[in-house]
Every structure is written in C-alpha cells, then in structure tokens.
Amino acid sequence: MGSKRPDRRGFIKSGAALAGGLTFGAAAPAIGQDQEHHGPSMIKEGKDQIAYGDRSKHVTSVRIAHGGRPSPDNWGLTFHIAAPLQDSVGVITPSSLHYIGTTRGSFLPDIDPKEHRLMIHGLVDRPLTFTMDDLKRLPSVTRLHFIECAGNRSSRRAKNVQETHGMTSCAEWTGVLLSTLLKECGLKGSATWFVAEGSEEVKGASSMPIAKAMEDCLIAYGMNGEAVRPQQGFPLRLMVPGFEGIFHTKWLRRIKVVDRYYINYNDFGHLDQDAKVAALDYQIGPKSVITFPSAGQQLPGKGFYEISGLAWSGGGAIKLVEISTDGGKRWNKAEIKGTAQRMAHARFGLMWNWDGKETELLSRCTDEIGQIQPSREQIAKYWNKPYDQTFSVPGLDNSIQPWKIASDGSVTNGFA
C-alpha cells in the first residue's frame, strides 16, 4: 500500500527524527569543541539592500509563464504567470511571487497615485469621484484572501504543481469596503448589478451582483503590508472574495451601478451558457492540492515525511482536509495549520511513514458550507462526459489531483 500512518504521539515519543528513524540518514553530529569551525562568509550590503531588502541568493523560487504563452511576448504583453506553490510555506504568497492573470494580455500601466481617481456612478443618488487620499481617510479593513484564475486546472502534460495549480495565490489585502463607498453614494431601488472597470488598454471590466458588493468586496490599496504591486493593480484593485480571478479588477478606475447583467468583453462568453455552466462561473469550489511531495520532486528514501499542501474555497473557510496515501482506498484526516480563514488558503499537513513502495497520494477538502472537493470521475458524471474529456470541461475545475510516487522516490503527475 506504500505507506503506514504513524501515530502522532508515537512518532514524537520514538524520537525518529533524532535517533536515525528517518531511514535516509540521521542528522549530522554536533561539532565538538575540539573541532575547528568556520562561520559563514559575510554579505556586503549596499544602499539598495538597506533601503529595500533582498532575499538570499540561495533562495531561487520564481514564477513561470503558464498556458504555453511566452510572457512577456515579443510585443511586451504579459499573459498568465504561475506562482511556485511547490516552494511555498505557510499560506501567504509573497507579493513578488503572486500569480499574474490576464486573458487578453496586457501592458503594465504606469499610474501616478496622485492623479488616479475612482468614479462611482450609474444608479446612485450621488455620483462621486474619490482620490487615493479620500479612500485612505475612510475606515479600512485588512483581510486574508486568495485569488484563483478559472484556467487553474490540471492536465496530463503538466510536470509539476506550479503548472497544475500555480494560478492561485493568497495575500493580505488592505483597503475600504465597497459597501462603504456605495452607502456614501446611495443606491437606487433598481440597482441589482455593478460593473467594475480597470485602466488597462482594453478597459477590462466585469459584471457582478450588487449583493456581492454589499457583502464583502474590498477596494484594496495595500497588499502584504505595502502598496499593491503594479502587476497586481496598483494603485487600486477590486477584491471579490471567493469569485474567480477575472472579477478582481486591477487598476480599478470606475464602478457603474446598473439594473441588469451588463454586456462587456469579459462577460460575453457567459451569454450562451446554460445554468449548469453559469453556476460555476463565479464562486470557486472547494479545492486542495498536495505541494510536497508533488510532481517533479524526489523523496531521498523511505521513512517519515510531512505531507503538506494548500486548500481553499469560495464558499468560505476550509473545515476538513483528508489525505489518502494509497490511491484513495483509505482517507486520513490532515491537520489544518492555525485557524482557517474565509476565502483564504489553508495550510494542511499529515505525518507519513513511506515504506518505499510505489503508491499514489491524494487530497480532498470540505468547506464550511459542506461542499466536498470532487474526484475526476465525479466531474465526468456531472457533465455526462467520458473521463478523457473532463480536462476541458466548461467552468472551473476543482477535481482531486493525484501524485504518483515510484519506488525510487520520484514523484510524477498521476494524470500523465
């Protein structure tokens, strides 16, 4: 079966990690007083490093172009860029590694925050225009939220978790609730939808229900303790917690309140959809993925490991994560690290004693409203499609991702 699940208390009592229980080798002995020990070489810091810190040269995690398009391309357009989930720790994605999503491709706007304005108009009593200073004078909130691109799905060609699931990230966002601004403007009785527009060349815009705006949408000017990065929408980004990434409008400049579903570029593809597809086009379903061990990684030998990964859902907080170490025959409850936040990544882990045999790892999650992450077989049944056609189903794909572990410790995509 490829594994034994250790008792947590027994694992600690056995002192496996300190007594050579990790069969690929015990920790090196401490250096004795009679042994010569040389400290590390010193880094000579310059003014740039003092002004804004660098990471260590030994840390090499980088984003990669996603979906087969070079980015930037020969014209300088940026397309999809995936985050290195395989190297992530905790739940917050560093701003410099946060994924980038743009279906059409975009040039990066160079916006002077002193000149930037946010206009709110349409079916409101008082159309208003806000400067950045105006927004920062209003009551602020700080919340942890993920964003995920609708194209974040596995394929048989994907070689690692960055290629299968790298189009999601989680950050701490600070700003003003959209409901605060809409209350200031005053909504007319016929207001049922709103349209958010960005400042990029094609004026990216999306239509959303006004109920969502009044619930938890955030006009963010801060990200991970500093200003929102230009690639993430500086100086303003609309955060729509739990909705697919295309609704999180970057370089936000205008919100129009309307009384019907508004036709624009981003929403045009939704017009022909039946209810079954449309239901999957806003809220992200429960989803999880094991980031270690995952495809492209190598286990050095049998013994104890902590299986680790991320889970998230547009339906709220993650309440349960389960892991199978035998291809789905049995499921074990994983530990959720810390307190899971609503519409945010949750880090999970499970101690595992690998016996060195070939096996398959899976994870699945359940959110606070009871939604359970489906298998690919369940996806096929839902769409009434053959299994082989489920990799291109409409809407969002939140199916379980398998990782195969060979007897030599190599890890590969279970769909390959």
What residues fall within each predicted segment?
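N-terminal secretory signal peptides
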Residues: 1-10, 20, 24, 31-33
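Generic cytosolic/nucleocytoplasmic N-terminal low-complexity/intrinsically disordered segments
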Residues: 3, 12, 43-46
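Sec-dependent signal peptide hydrophobic core
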Residues: 15-19
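Structured, non-membrane catalytic/scaffold regions adjacent to prosthetic-group chemistry
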Residues: 33-416
